[in-house]
Regions:
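Residue-level detector of anion-binding/catalytic polar loops
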Residues: 35, 69, 90
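Electropositive, surface-exposed helix/loop patches at the edges of structured domains
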Residues: 32, 36, 75-83
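Alpha-helix-loop-beta-strand connector modules within alpha/beta enzyme cores
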Residues: 1-22, 50-78, 111-114
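Glycine-rich phosphate-binding active-site loops on the catalytic face of alpha/beta enzymes
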Residues: 1-5, 38-50, 81-113
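Structural motif
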Residues: 32, 65, 86-89
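Hydrophobic/aromatic ligand-binding patch that stacks against planar heteroaromatic rings
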Residues: 28, 62, 83
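Histidine/lysine/aspartate-rich catalytic loop segments that bind and position anionic ligands
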Residues: 16, 20-48
Length: 114
């Protein structure tokens, strides 16, 4: 669904657009006044099939051309999240590391992200 249709249905709710690793999609998201831009997958993940990985270069490009918050997604865990924050990601979307972690409970997994 495009963002214009989503806005009609959801009114003033927060709406984001996943742009994968595409500068073109980032520009479209900005033009369509999205509330946040998601970029990824940055790392291997079992959550979704990923055709190609997102790059730090794309994250930095998005940060350079917009003030819209950037959410990074895909395979983020305790050993790689800092690289994304150091490169100006506003938010981290972390799922499998927390909920499907075979070594740590969700609470302990979250605590390792400090």
């Amino acid at each position: 669904m495009n963002i214009k249709k989503a806005r009609k249905i959801l009114k003033n709710k927060t709406i984001g657009i996943t742009c994968h690793n595409s500068k073109k999609l980032i520009k479209e998201a900005i033009h369509n006044k999205t509330d946040y831009i998601a970029i990824g997958s940055f790392f291997y993940t079992k959550t979704k099939k990923v055709k190609s990985r997102a790059s730090i270069k794309t994250l930095l490009y998005a940060k350079k051309i917009t003030k819209i918050p950037i959410v990074v997604i895909g395979g983020i865990k305790d050993t790689n999240y800092k690289k994304l924050l150091l490169n100006k990601a506003n938010f981290l979307a972390i799922s499998s590391y927390i909920w499907n972690n075979k070594k740590l409970s969700p609470v302990k997994a979250i605590r390792k992200l400090k």
